[in-house]
């Protein structure tokens, strides 16, 4: 859904950059899902891999000038050096969309992801089933049911987007998610 959001708020986007540590299996899995989502939406995904947080600045710079937006997943290595990505995106006027709502205030345009506390609450019944003896293989996989969309209005204004038109595009995005049976809570930062 993050890439649907990118299409909604950066409609001219053709190429999206992403940074991740290929040694983190969760990041590789997420990146594979990102590739599929981009294909479905007609976006080209340009990847920059990193081995440590020290690599993040140069990796982000390698994407500048080649992408219309940058997406950062919950990759531990990249998120630990998010300030470097923010510096590059700010210097190059590239919208930054992230998957971790707790970090949007660092300088991303928007974040779409789950609330870790609520996700823990959703997981509790599963843990109880396991503690009562049910095999994990007998329990269906669940994804976060509710998402939070955090918008950084300071960045909206900095990149010259009309706050009201931005709100309209975000509202239509949230409505689409809700029509699909999901829920999106929109949280505005910087007003």
Residue ranges and their predicted role:
Residues 1-191:
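Short hydrophobic alpha-helices and adjacent helix-cap/hinge residues
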